[in-house]
């Protein structure tokens, strides 16, 4: 069982490893040019470097999720065992899946209910598939865990999504569930979108500014924000703050100071 100290240690070491990989790649990055190099040369180079770090950090959230889940007793599966090997879906099942998507969008069913209806359709029609394929680009998962007979699968996204993305993300959830139920019709599935942190001062502000983008998805069930996600994986309250405390400690480390100097040097390079 995890506690505050173990969550902190896992977050610290997982993030440190990610920073080491990013630092190693910094010196090998291919320098590019655009018009802002003329207008704001140093700032543009710093932005480019930091943007690469933000992109790299996406893999850190995934690794941290796996590390915490594993330490808290979840069985973990490689995401590519799913993304590169799903059953081919028949046209009638695709049509039924889309029917459930439309019913969800008109709020006639919840996502959980839609998944249960897809399960019933597969079982009643005795559907199976021997053909395999890769998940379509952009529709794969970032994590796949199991605990107490329930599979948790999902994607980790930016907490600031575009307007209307809720419908697209909800469709992804139905796609993932359909693939798993074709392979294991009796599997209990919790398919979610995870946002690793709240960029605003509090939850209420987040929901007022971002929540409408995900309608009719429901927070806490269909998408998980910050502690809703990390506490689910770790079993420890206030996990997001603990994770960011680890980041704060890393910000004062020799490694970060070295990276800051590397960024400064690269931004001056011509």
What are the roles of these predicted feature ranges?
Residues 5, 9, 130-133, 194-198:
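Extended alpha-helical scaffold and adjacent linker segments that couple domains
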Residues 17-20, 36-39, 61-65, 79-98, ...:
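Charge-enriched interaction surfaces
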Residues 1-87, 265-270:
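Nuclease-adjacent, charged terminal/linker segments that flank catalytic cores
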Residues 81-148:
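Active-site metal-binding core of divalent-cation-utilizing nuclease and nuclease-like domains
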Residues 163, 189-270:
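Domain-level recognition of nuclease-like catalytic cores that cleave nucleotide substrates
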Residues 159-183:
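Mg2+/Mn2+-dependent nuclease catalytic core
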């Amino acid at each position: 069982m995890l506690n505050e100290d173990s969550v902190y240690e896992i977050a610290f070491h997982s993030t440190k490893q990610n920073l080491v990989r990013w630092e190693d790649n910094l010196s090998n990055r291919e320098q590019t040019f655009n018009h802002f190099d003329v207008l704001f040369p140093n700032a543009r180079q710093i932005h480019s470097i930091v943007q690469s770090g933000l992109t790299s950090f996406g893999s850190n959230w995934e690794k941290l999720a796996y590390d915490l889940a594993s330490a808290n007793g979840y069985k973990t599966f490689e995401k590519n065992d799913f993304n590169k090997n799903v059953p081919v879906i028949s046209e009638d099942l695709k049509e039924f899946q889309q029917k459930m998507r439309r019913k969800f969008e008109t709020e006639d069913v919840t996502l959980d209910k839609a998944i249960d209806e897809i399960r019933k359709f597969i079982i009643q029609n005795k559907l199976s598939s021997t053909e395999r394929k890769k998940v379509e680009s952009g529709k794969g998962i970032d994590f796949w865990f199991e605990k107490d007979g329930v599979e948790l699968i999902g994607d980790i996204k930016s907490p600031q999504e575009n307007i209307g993305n809720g419908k697209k993300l909800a469709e992804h959830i139905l796609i993932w569930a359909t693939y798993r139920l074709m392979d294991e019709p009796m599997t209990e599935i919790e398919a979610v979108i995870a946002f690793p942190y709240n960029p605003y001062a509090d939850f209420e502000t987040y929901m007022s500014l971002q929540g409408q983008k995900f309608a009719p998805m429901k927070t806490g069930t269909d998408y998980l924000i910050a502690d809703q996600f990390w506490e689910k994986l770790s079993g420890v309250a206030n996990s997001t703050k603990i994770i960011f405390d680890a980041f704060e400690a890393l910000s004062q480390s020799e490694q970060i100071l070295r990276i800051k100097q590397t960024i400064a040097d690269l931004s001056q390079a011509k």
